[in-house]
Amino acid sequence: MTMFKGSNEMKSRWNWGSITCIICFTCVGSQLSMSSSKASNFSGPLQLYQRELEIFIVLTDVPNYRLIKENSHLHTTIVDQGRTV
């Protein structure tokens, strides 16, 4: 027994709304966890580009700094005249 005509349509719309809500919370949650301290070492393409850009800015603003890339690693080290900074 339905209370009004179109009850199935309302249920369907409610389900789609809740699914959309769950997807939104999942996306927001994953973005927050990506920016948390535990996920700060994530080496995805966007994070690598951003880190390279920040290092480039530091290197171009401060004279006598050079960038050394470790062999076969994506990590970078900044060295100031032989001393690791």
From Swiss-Prot:
Tissue: Expressed in kidney. Expressed in endothelial cells.
Listed transmembrane segments: 19-37
Primary residence: membrane
GO CC, alphabetical: plasma membrane
Chain ranges on the Cytoplasmic side, renumbered to this chain: 38-85
Record localization: Cell membrane
Domain of life assignment: Eukaryota
Keywords of this entry: Cell membrane, Membrane, Receptor, Transmembrane, Transmembrane helix
One annotated GO biological process: vascular endothelial growth factor signaling pathway
Molecular function terms from GO: endothelin receptor activity; vascular endothelial growth factor binding
Membrane topology: Single-pass membrane protein
Processing after translation: N-glycosylated.
Record topological domains on the Extracellular side: 1-18
Task of the protein: Dual receptor for both endothelin-1 and the signal sequence of vascular endothelial growth factor A. Does not act as a receptor for angiotensin-2. Does not bind the VEGFA mature protein. May play a role in angiogenesis with a significant role in cardiovascular and neural development.
Name this polypeptide is given: Dual endothelin-1/VEGF signal peptide receptor
Biological source species: Homo sapiens (Human)
Taxonomic lineage of the native organism: Eukaryota, Metazoa, Chordata, Craniata, Vertebrata
Designated gene of the protein: FBXW7-AS1
